[in-house]
């Protein structure tokens, strides 16, 4: 049986106004069959308002792909927590591997963004994961643990309910490769222990998502793992039929 309760779509720099309409309509048709699964869509910033309007009466949460650690000021091109909240955003991706690799986001920045997000009352979806060289060298857990511990630093226990961890093996993002259910579960089990160590019993209930080429045909097997509570979906979240099928796999 699936263990999933949260599925997040990350559209990255894709999509348009038409996709907000067709995707929300496709999900709306199936919402009564997906009552055990929380659905979140993270579109590009320019589509947040449009998607929020499309989903106004639906149980579909709106997420952002990034946020500034600053509250405002002379930070050209950045966006604050307050500006996101004005458009109904309740989830924020923090530390995605593409932000770390392409935009030089450091562990310190990821931590500051996570703190800014939860302090504003939104849920921070903190992304961690190793690249292929690190996995091949046997350093998967060392890398993942270091990223997770750095991102969670100074987060008080009372904020634990506003934290989601997403394990995204970098070598499996957009490559067609996927960690086996057993490989993913191994990392998730260790992340679960890390959360319990830092936050106590509530760590048992904090969502752990898998992100790394999740597709309609492998979602059910991944979601059946004990410590995989859902998915962070990239490419497959851009096609209505594929994303609906993944959400249905989470529901079981």
From Swiss-Prot:
It is an enzyme of class 5 (isomerase). Homodimer. The gene is tpiA. InterPro entries: Aldolase_TIM (IPR013785), TIM_sf (IPR035990), TrioseP_Isoase_bac/euk (IPR022896), Triosephosphate_isomerase (IPR000652), Triosephosphate_isomerase_AS (IPR020861). This is Triosephosphate isomerase. The lineage of its organism: Bacteria, Pseudomonadati, Pseudomonadota, Gammaproteobacteria, Alteromonadales. Involved in the gluconeogenesis. Catalyzes stereospecifically the conversion of dihydroxyacetone phosphate (DHAP) to D-glyceraldehyde-3-phosphate (G3P). Pathway: Carbohydrate biosynthesis; gluconeogenesis; Carbohydrate degradation; glycolysis; D-glyceraldehyde 3-phosphate from glycerone phosphate: step 1/1. It comes from Idiomarina loihiensis (strain ATCC BAA-735 / DSM 15497 / L2-TR). GO terms for cellular component: cytosol. GO terms for molecular function: triose-phosphate isomerase activity. It catalyses: D-glyceraldehyde 3-phosphate = dihydroxyacetone phosphate.
């Amino acid at each position: 049986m699936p263990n999933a309760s949260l599925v997040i779509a990350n559209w990255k720099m894709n999509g348009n106004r038409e996709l907000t309409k067709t995707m929300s309509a496709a999900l709306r048709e199936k919402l009564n069959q997906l009552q055990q699964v929380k659905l979140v869509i993270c579109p590009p910033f320019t589509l947040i308002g449009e998607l929020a309007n499309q989903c106004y009466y639906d149980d579909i949460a709106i997420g952002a792909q990034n946020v500034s650690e600053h509250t405002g000021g002379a930070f050209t091109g950045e966006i604050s927590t307050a500006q996101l909240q004005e458009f109904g955003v309740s989830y924020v991706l923090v530390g995605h591997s593409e932000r770390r690799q392409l935009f030089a986001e450091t562990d310190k920045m990821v931590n500051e963004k996570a703190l800014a997000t939860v302090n504003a009352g939104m849920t921070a979806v903190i992304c961690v994961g190793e690249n292929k060289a690190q996995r091949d060298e046997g350093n998967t857990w060392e890398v993942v643990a270091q990223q997770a511990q750095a991102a969670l630093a100074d987060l008080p226990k009372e904020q634990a309910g506003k934290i989601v961890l997403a394990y995204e093996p970098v070598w499996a993002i957009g490559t067609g490769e996927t960690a086996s259910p057993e490989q993913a579960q191994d990392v998730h089990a260790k992340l679960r222990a890390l959360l319990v160590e830092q936050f106590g019993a509530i760590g048992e209930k904090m969502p752990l998502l898998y992100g790394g080429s999740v597709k309609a045909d492998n979602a059910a097997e991944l979601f059946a793992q004990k410590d995989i509570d859902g998915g962070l979906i990239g490419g497959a979240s851009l096609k209505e039929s594929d994303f609906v099928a993944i959400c249905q796999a989470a529901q079981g």
